[in-house]
């Protein structure tokens, strides 16, 4: 089952759920396509996450068939700020492995954000700080209002605005860490991580 950009969800929480027919599911709450959403994964299926427990802010994708969720895959580990190794690289491209496809993810800390363009660095120095030297900056179009603000400390996911994106130029050490969700290199969603 192919996964695409229309199924990207920012994970909030999961719980066991039993419906009126006594069928068991994993109830997954998240933010998808500009709204809060709940999906139900049959108990005979598992979330593909390489054994990692999902936490608020992780990015997942799901696939439905005949109205039922058939597959859930973890793409981004928010706590580690790394793309998950879930074996779905043929379905999505991460940080520079950009191809003209229906789904790409770009992550890093914001160096500058102005006039619909964002410069990111995904390279860290030996001290663990983002390196904003010219060779490490990548430029992307970023003209969307589909913005999500993830507070990892308080475990909340809320709608955000463009003014929530803080750049290194303006905020120095308080620059935003973001993930851009793109389709055919057009930014469809910005996920901002704080806390």
Set out the residue ranges of the language-model regions.
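...the same signal can extend to comparable exposed beta-sheet modules
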Residues: 1-195
């Amino acid at each position: 089952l192919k996964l695409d950009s229309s199924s990207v969800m920012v994970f909030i929480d999961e719980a066991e759920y039993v419906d009126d027919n006594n069928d068991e599911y994993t109830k997954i709450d998240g933010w998808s396509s500009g709204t809060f959403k709940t999906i139900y994964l049959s108990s005979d299926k598992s979330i593909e996450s390489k054994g990692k427990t999902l936490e608020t802010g992780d990015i997942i994708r799901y696939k439905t068939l005949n109205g039922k969720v058939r597959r859930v895959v973890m793409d981004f580990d928010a706590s580690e700020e790394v793309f998950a190794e879930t074996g779905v690289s043929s379905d999505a491209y991460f940080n520079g492995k950009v191809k003209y496809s229906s789904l790409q993810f770009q992550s890093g800390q914001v160096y500058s954000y102005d006039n619909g363009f964002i410069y990111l660095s995904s390279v860290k120095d030996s001290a663990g700080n983002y390196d904003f030297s010219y060779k490490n900056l990548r430029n992307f179009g970023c003209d969307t209002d589909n913005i999500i603000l993830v507070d990892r400390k308080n475990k909340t996911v809320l709608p955000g605005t463009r003014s929530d994106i803080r750049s290194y130029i303006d905020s120095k050490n308080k620059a935003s860490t973001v993930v851009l969700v793109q389709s055919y290199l057009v930014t469809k969603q910005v996920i901002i991580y704080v806390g």
